[in-house]
Amino acid sequence: MVGNGIDHHPTKAGMVIAWLFDEEAKAVFGPRPMITDLRTGAMAGGSGEQAVLTASAIQMARHYGLPSSTIAGATHSKLPDAQSGYEKCLTVNQSVQAGANIITHTCGAQASLMGISFEAMVIDNDMLGCILRATNPVEVSPKTLSAPEIGAVVNEVGHFLGETATFDRMHSDFLYPEIADRADIEVWEAGGSIDIRQAAARRVQEILAEHRPNYIDAGVDRDLRALLPIELLPLA
């Protein structure tokens, strides 16, 4: 595994060549170390070893003071299940913690990047939001410490729920997942006892039914459809 780092030198060489042609050329150090399961020869993109190699490549970029790009979020699972979740979170979180500037392939990919799942995209969106929230620095200041509010609560009402500072922190300090379940058991059972894959499937159907972005002028859209056999839903 350590020798894998040698393979990153051609990437740096390519950047040097670009700068020889143009000193102002924009270049990103983007190594893609990948792990193979030696029992089968298949890619093991969701493994702990993959997380370590990716982090080491990113740290190499930081050592040289270069902006970095990498891939993370691969899983060998064919479905957006528990294996998919832990493998994706492992490699994405490790890459973020290592300091990657750009991370691709983080959302929706299944079966070692050979397939895409809409449900996985929705689930992974929650996961990625939590990872990014976990990497935000904690701001320590008189305002965030809220010592006067703490003193007032201790000596008076006995709880923070009615405080303005609590309401403000609710909107500034917390990220609320879109589909992850945080209800108590009774509410969950009353809602049909669905798991996250079922919740994601519902959200996918809502998005497909309601989200109709219009990026192309209606006239251009008609001309393209008349010229080419494009089998897409017409613009609303």
Place the predicted regions along the sequence by residue.
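Acidic/polar loop patches that form or flank catalytic/metal-binding clefts of enzymes
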Residues: 66-72, 102-107, 137-147
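Catalytic-core signal marking the mid-to-C-terminal active-site face
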Residues: 119-236
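Short glycine/threonine-rich loop-to-helix capping motif typified by GTGT followed
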Residues: 38-49, 79-89, 115-126, 155-162, ...
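Glycine-rich phosphate-binding active-site loops on the catalytic face of alpha/beta enzymes
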Residues: 94-114
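Histidine (H) residue identity feature
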Residues: 7-9, 63, 76, 105, ...
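Helix-rich catalytic cores of soluble enzyme domains
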Residues: 1-101
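A glycine-rich phosphate-binding loop feature that marks nucleotide/adenosyl-phosphate handling sites
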Residues: 29-37, 71-80, 108-114, 147-155, ...
